[in-house]
Every structure is written in structure tokens, then in C-alpha cells.
């Protein structure tokens, strides 16, 4: 049974969602603000559902604090039409963003998709335990990436993007392939979430000696590892 942390200041909605999630077989704990969520945060949670608009500490600030100490998958619950919240959430390392009001079945489907990915970091991407390149090492059994033995603190999406690029050995990996393999959905014209995850990955990777970057963008084609 997967344990979830649901964070929302709307007590009535929290109770309704808790009931829904428990009927789907999840073990749900709740928090009504960001400070309470941070106090409860521990390694036993498989996913955090995090509302944006909350008193004391809003969802964006709470996400920042979570990412300082944990790579637990986070789904942001945003107000419909508030694109800035969605963009900020993805930039700060959220795994997904779902606008309110949402369809119950879509919420459950997205939660299960995130849990599938996080449960198997090497799912459909690699059948080896370790993959190394120029100081970077991917540890598939733990789903972590290190550089010179220092944890890069990548999210699940960032880890899988880096894995595909390292395995490509300099060949182009299309945006369509990244979307299907990493996010398990086809690429759509106006969805910029993949670009946000790639941008976050670039920021987390250290500077390379004698080379401008770890991977390059090929306009209209995709991305390729700089070997």
C-alpha cells in the first residue's frame, strides 16, 4: 500500500480526496498547511499532493523546502488558469501539476503513473545497475545520480532524461522519444513540462572542464550528449 501525503488548507476537500484515495487502496495522511507538511515529511511517503494556495507557507515555498531535503515525487494542485504556478512548480522540481477543479479519474491515473515511474527507476530505460560517463554515475537500484560521488539530487524525470542521453552516446534523442519514454505520454504542441525538466537538469549538472555543456539542443530534432 502506497503512503501519500495530501496537503491542502481546504478541510472539506481534503476529507473528500482522502476518502477517494483510500478507496483506491492508498494510505493517506493529511496536512492543512505547508509548515505542517514539512513537519510530517519523511521517507515513507511515496508521493506528496501539494496545493499551491495555502496560508502560513504556500505550496511553492513548501516545494522549495521539500526539495532541499527530499526527492519524493510531488504533484502540485493549482488553480485553473494560473499558468505561473504550474511553470514555477515544474521549475522547482514538481513531477506533475494538475489544475483545480479536476476529474477524480484523472487524478488517480496521474498518481498511479508517477508511482509506476518512481517505483522502477530503470523501467524500459536500462537493464544495468550502474551507468557512468565522465564523472557522472547513475545508480539504478536507488534511482540516484552522482557526480564524483556527490548526489545530484535529481527528480525521477531528470534521472530518466539523463539516462537516455547518456545511453545515446552522442546520438540525437528526439523530444518525442523523451516524452514517451520519460513521461509516458505523447508530446503535445503546447505542453512545456518536458522543457522545464530539461532546464532543471541543466542547472543541476556541474560545469564540465574544457566543454561547454553536457548535452546540446538541436533545434527541430532533439538533444544529444556532448562526448
From Swiss-Prot:
Free-text function comment from the UniProt entry: Member of a two-component regulatory system.
SMART domains: REC (SM00448), Trans_reg_C (SM00862)
Modifications after synthesis and translation: Phosphorylated.
Domain of life: Bacteria
Coiled coil ranges: none
Modification sites for 4-aspartylphosphate: 51
Principal location class: cytoplasm
Keywords: Cytoplasm, DNA-binding, Phosphoprotein, Transcription, Transcription regulation, Two-component regulatory system
InterPro entries: CheY-like_superfamily (IPR011006), OmpR/PhoB-type_DNA-bd (IPR001867), Sig_transdc_resp-reg_C-effctor (IPR016032), Sig_transdc_resp-reg_receiver (IPR001789), WalR-like (IPR039420), WH-like_DNA-bd_sf (IPR036388)
Protein name: Transcriptional regulatory protein CpxR homolog
Domain Response regulatory positions: 3-115
A GO cellular-component term linked to this record: protein-DNA complex
DNA-binding residues: 128-227
GO biological process, one term: regulation of DNA-templated transcription
Pfam families given in the database record: Response_reg, Trans_reg_C
Location relative to the cell: Cytoplasm
Organism of this sequence: Haemophilus influenzae (strain ATCC 51907 / DSM 11121 / KW20 / Rd)
One function term, GO molecular function aspect: phosphorelay response regulator activity
Amino acid at each position: 500500500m502506497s503512503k501519500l501525503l495530501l496537503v491542502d488548507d481546504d478541510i472539506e476537500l481534503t476529507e473528500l480526496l482522502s476518502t477517494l484515495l483510500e478507496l483506491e487502496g492508498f494510505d493517506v495522511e493529511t496536512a492543512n498547511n505547508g509548515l505542517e507538511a514539512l513537519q510530517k515529511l519523511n521517507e515513507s511517503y511515496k508521493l506528496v499532493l501539494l496545493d499551491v494556495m495555502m496560508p502560513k507557507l504556500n505550496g511553492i515555498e513548501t516545494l522549495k523546502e521539500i526539495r532541499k531535503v527530499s526527492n519524493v515525487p510531488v504533484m502540485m494542485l493549482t488553480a485553473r488558469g494560473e499558468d505561473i504556478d504550474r511553470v514555477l512548480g515544474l521549475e522547482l522540481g514538481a513531477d506533475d501539476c494538475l489544475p483545480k477543479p479536476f476529474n477524480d479519474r484523472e487524478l488517480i491515473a496521474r498518481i498511479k503513473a508517477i508511482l509506476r515511474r518512481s517505483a522502477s527507476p530503470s523501467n524500459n530505460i536500462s537493464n544495468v545497475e550502474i551507468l557512468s560517463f565522465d564523472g557522472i554515475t547513475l545508480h539504478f537500484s536507488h534511482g540516484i545520480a552522482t557526480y564524483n560521488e556527490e548526489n545530484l539530487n535529481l527528480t525521477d524525470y531528470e534521472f530518466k532524461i539523463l539516462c537516455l542521453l547518456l545511453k545515446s552516446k552522442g546520438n540525437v534523442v528526439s523530444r518525442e522519444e523523451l516524452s514517451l519514454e520519460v513521461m509516458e505520454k505523447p508530446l503535445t504542441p503546447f505542453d512545456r513540462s518536458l522543457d522545464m525538466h530539461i532546464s532543471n537538469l541543466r542547472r543541476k549538472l556541474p560545469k564540465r572542464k574544457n566543454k561547454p555543456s553536457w548535452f546540446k539542443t538541436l533545434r527541430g530534432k532533439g538533444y544529444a550528449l556532448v562526448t
